[in-house]
Amino acid sequence: MDDKELIEYFKSQMKEDPDMASAVAAIRTLLEFLKRDKGETIQGLRANLTSAIETLCGVDSSVAVSSGGELFLRFISLTSLEYSDYSKCKKIMIERGELFLRRISLSRNKIADLCHTFIKDGATILTHAYSRVVLRVLEAAVAAKKRFSVYVTESQPDLSGKKMAKALCHLNVPVTVVLDAAVGYIMEKADLVIVGAEGVVENGGIINKIGTNQMAVCAKAQNKPFYAVAESFKFVRLFPLNQQDVPDKFKYKADTLKVAQTGQDLKEEHPWVDYTAPSLITLLFTDLGVLTPSAVSDELIKLYL
């Protein structure tokens, strides 16, 4: 499976199911790559998979694709030392890969079951941009016959908040789209804030769509709970202390980074994500359970060791 086939397969997965997270599509692609690989050694197979992950990160530069790919590789590689026979080892790796995929497919429902209980009847929720996990949580709250209303930021520059509002309208949830600049104004009307995350970093902070950080700062100033929801495959080995510590490969779209390689200055570009410090986050809801930001490092160590 060459780079062109790999990219085409990844894009076809995304097109088939628009509701699928890019990281899940990347893991499906890597599993298919593993099945088709014609390598003859475990070391060669690992090298090929690492190269495939780098190729996919070049197509979709989100944090989740990078962390999901790395966790997939670690999960399937745990068996490589147990078997000396290559064909048997590869078969076990494929089985473990399929198990990993099944596990992460159930993540959103687990998170929704944990988080929707924190939404009280009659609550007013503020959310940011479009998040599939947040949407699943709100679907679970609707299914539990809870009445609530939602404010969603329009989320420039792609207006993904309007997509979220449309999805909530289909659930018959009262929803109002507000300007990104109106977060401080609208915060006093909200009872709680729920946002998704593109990545959860080692100190318990999150990397998410630009504008998340200012929302968290406003929530903290007005003593409103700020909840983040994210699947465990988004746990990434990064330890940023400020916005500048977030690598450019996560801040900008893949196309922008390619243009930057020709010499264009990235200072002219707007970043797509920002970093929210753990001190601003009340709780993180993951498929591993409900975590305080300080507990994230323990879970991350378990995942990566």
Swiss-Prot record:
Activated by the chemical integrated stress response (ISR) inhibitor ISRIB which stimulates guanine nucleotide exchange factor activity for both phosphorylated and unphosphorylated eIF2. Belongs to the eIF-2B alpha/beta/delta subunits family. It is found in: Cytoplasm, Cytosol. Its main location: cytoplasm. Keywords: Acetylation, Cytoplasm, Initiation factor, Protein biosynthesis. It comes from Macaca fascicularis. The modification N6-acetyllysine is found at residue 35. Gene3D superfamilies: Translation initiation factor eif-2b, domain 2 (3.40.50.10470), Translation initiation factor eIF-2B, N-terminal domain (1.20.120.1070). The keyword Cytoplasm applies. This is Translation initiation factor eIF2B subunit alpha. Component of the translation initiation factor 2B (eIF2B) complex which is a heterodecamer of two sets of five different subunits: alpha, beta, gamma, delta and epsilon. Subunits alpha, beta and delta comprise a regulatory subcomplex and subunits epsilon and gamma comprise a catalytic subcomplex. Within the complex, the hexameric regulatory complex resides at the center, with the two heterodimeric catalytic subcomplexes bound on opposite sides. Acts as a component of the translation initiation factor 2B (eIF2B) complex, which catalyzes the exchange of GDP for GTP on eukaryotic initiation factor 2 (eIF2) gamma subunit. Its guanine nucleotide exchange factor activity is repressed when bound to eIF2 complex phosphorylated on the alpha subunit, thereby limiting the amount of methionyl-initiator methionine tRNA available to the ribosome and consequently global translation is repressed. The keyword Nucleus does not apply. GO terms for molecular function: guanyl-nucleotide exchange factor activity; translation initiation factor activity.
